[in-house]
Amino acid sequence: MKLAPWALLAVAMAWGWAFVIMKDAIQRQSVNNFLFTRFLLGTVVLVLIRPQVLRLLNKDVLLRAGAAGTFLGLGFIFQTLGLARTGAAITGFVTGLYVVLTPLIAWLVLKQKVNSFTWSCIAVATVGLGLLSIHGFSVGIGELLVFISAICFACHIIALSKWSSGRDVYAMTVVQLFMCGLLSGIASIPGGYSPPPDASVWGVVIFTAVFATAIAFIIQTWAQAHMSPTKVAVILTMEVVFAAIFAIIFGGERLTLQSALGGILVVTAMYLIVIKESK
């Protein structure tokens, strides 16, 4: 499907922008509270736009989308726990390792073969992620928690590639977002829930809920019915590149030679995958 890789690239762009605007918001609201509000609002928006989707929530959709949403929700929670214990740059790199974990898990679980061209793109993307993110590295509990999140994100990509085809994309997305909200809500219980403290944070919540959550996951769920999980993972690594670009343009961050080289490598890997997929 020629449109699918470009649609996923748009998703990566939305997530990259969300990463930049969330930085200030999660300083003023706990991350789990932010995620709970974001995913709950995203679910409500989807249901309000198309209320008849509730009739499509049969056992098959609930089980498969619920499982995919559980992987996604756990990924966000473990990533958050790790982020509290290690640096943001290292968190970005370790999370991005799902580009390596996705084909490995797909090979082990689904027996999907990965050709040498795709493995080459994976290697290039991984090196690029490292150059973009790493400025010193040590392995501790934070890094291990983030690595678990990368496994969860890889499992989410594989689950969507396995279960999206032949099922209603909208219904699948609603259930996934609900599961993420439910898990984030449970994670918020120990510290209690507090709503966004001001209009600025509410603005970020609304943007991420509508564009980086509801619309983005509809596109991802649809696109993955037409692409292999490994190629999806490589394209989605562009989130890190877009985040860096937006941070430089709008956040006043400085572009280093190392970051530039890393970005070029990730873009190269993504471009090769997209061009091959579009043929």
PLM-predicted stretches and their roles:
Residues 6, 10, 37-41, 67-70, ...:
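Hydrophobic residues within alpha-helical transmembrane segments
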Residues 25, 34, 38, 82, ...:
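Hydrophobic/aromatic residues within transmembrane alpha-helices
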Residues 46, 72, 105, 114-133, ...:
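Hydrophobic transmembrane alpha-helices of multi-pass small-molecule transport proteins
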Residues 28-74, 101-105, 152-159, 173-191, ...:
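Transmembrane alpha-helices of multi-pass small-molecule transport proteins
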Residues 8, 20, 31-35, 65, ...:
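Alpha-helical transmembrane segments and their helix-entry boundary regions
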Residues 9-21, 49, 66-85, 131, ...:
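Hydrophobic alpha-helical transmembrane segments of multi-pass membrane transport proteins
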Residues 33-44, 80-112, 118, 149, ...:
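Specific alpha-helical transmembrane segments that line the substrate/conduction pathway
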Residues 1-10, 43-67, 85, 108-119, ...:
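Membrane-interface interhelical linkers
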